[in-house]
């Protein structure tokens, strides 16, 4: 899918970004995770392939991560959701959610947008369930 057709769905407030915890992983290094979901309608585009993408600035580097992919229904509606795993070396700034359609679209209706940091799992909760 071409980045040329990207449509901004929304910018995540910095107070939400600052609530996210950073985890250290073996393979990806430092990452932070966000739950992302959006109900959208792409007028006049039934069956259109689309992706939900998160874009952000990490220091001076522009990065992006795919969240979900799908096709719009018969009236052009779709729910896209997933966890955005964002590698970070410095600090996440200017976090934005974009729709990436396969073809150019003139108008989208954003029924709902949800972005929230993934809650870290407490160690004592893991042992209590074991």
Q: What feature does the model see in each segment?
A:
Residues 1-130:
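Extracellular and organelle-lumenal recognition/adhesion modules and their flexible linkers in secreted
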